[in-house]
Design a protein with these regions (language model features):
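A compositional/biophysical signature of low hydrophobicity enriched in polar/charged and small residues
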Residues: 1-116
Length: 116
């Protein structure tokens, strides 16, 4: 496969009505068999979750979630995320503004690196 994974249109989430963006730290129950795989499978099915990253540190995963409003996020939290059996703790931080949001990789100078 080449360098291009896929071609997409970048949509304006606010114009489409998704005014709330939340970054969610999730800690899973320790020692639960298959907890990571089950969590990942369920999160992949949630359309509200734009990104899911496994972390090293205090929490296990970081999710980027969008909803139309705060009530929509509350419903997502209560009816989807919090009922996953392996979820032990959730910490939510609502974004007030996006200072930089890009999908561009820093390609300038990529081949000019000196490994010597």
């Amino acid at each position: 496969m080449g360098y291009v994974e896929r071609r997409v249109a970048v949509l304006d989430r606010r114009r489409l009505g998704f005014r709330v963006m939340v970054f969610v730290h999730v800690k899973l129950v320790r020692g639960a068999r298959n907890s990571v795989a089950e969590f990942e499978e369920q999160v992949r099915a949630f359309p509200e979750v734009l990104e899911c990253h496994m972390l090293m540190g205090e929490t296990d995963f970081l999710l980027k979630v969008v909803t139309q409003d705060v009530e929509g996020y509350e419903q997502f939290l209560r009816n989807k995320l919090s009922i996953i059996p392996s979820v032990q703790e959730v910490q939510s931080s609502m974004a007030l503004a996006s200072v930089k949001c890009t999908t561009e990789l820093p390609l300038a100078g990529l081949g000019a690196r000196d490994d010597g």
